[in-house]
UniProtKB/Swiss-Prot annotation:
Predominant cellular place of this UniProt entry's protein: membrane
Protein name (record): Disulfide bond formation protein B
Domain of life: Bacteria
Transmembrane segments: 12-28, 47-63, 70-87, 144-162
Pfam families (alphabetical): DsbB
Organism of origin: Nitrosospira multiformis (strain ATCC 25196 / NCIMB 11849 / C 71)
Length: 168
């Protein structure tokens, strides 16, 4: 008899690993490539952290149906929120004239949070949201982030809707 939670646990572990990899790459871009995170980047980092930690909690907890749905629902909300922020940043990259220069209220707010003081390398916003310094396959960093958030949202919805009696 196979464990019906095994596919779900594998997906949760994959979600956690993916989020950890994305956060690691963001730190690489910041610390090695000197690409400073903007306020919207920091919010996306927070969303990746929340998704990843929720997936990790679900992986270790291995809850029944209701608990699994709560974890998956939270991950989906975090993924959709992060995706909206990434799409907003992608819009700002394409229409930089809509962006005001100087310290934004978002930057001041984020930098005043305890997270920014506790771990400034990860959560302090110092960059310009409309600055395009990185592209891959003609897509900017916010474009790729939006794609990854969509993938994470889809996986979260799958975990939310999968039936327990499904076989491997």
């Amino acid at each position: 008899m196979s464990n019906p939670m095994r596919p779900v646990r594998s997906i949760l572990l994959a979600i956690f690993t993916g989020c950890a990899g994305l956060i690691g790459y963001a730190l690489y871009l910041q610390l090695v490539e000197n690409l400073l995170p903007c306020p919207l980047c920091v919010v996306q980092r927070m969303a990746y952290w929340l998704i990843g930690l929720t997936a990790l909690a679900g992986f270790f907890h291995t809850p029944e149906t209701t608990g699994r749905r709560i974890y998956a629902g939270l991950m989906a909300v975090f993924a959709f929120t992060g995706g909206l922020v990434a799409l907003r940043q992608a819009w700002l990259v394409r229409y930089p004239e809509a962006f005001e220069c100087g310290i934004s209220p978002e930057e001041a707010f984020l930098n005043a949070l305890p997270l920014a003081r506790w771990w400034p390398v990860m959560f302090e916003a110092n960059g310009d949201c409309a600055d395009v310094t990185w592209k891959f396959a003609s897509l900017t960093l916010p474009d790729w982030s939006a794609i990854f958030f969509m993938i994470l949202a889809a996986l979260s919805i799958y975990v939310l809707l999968v039936r327990e009696n499904q076989r491997e």
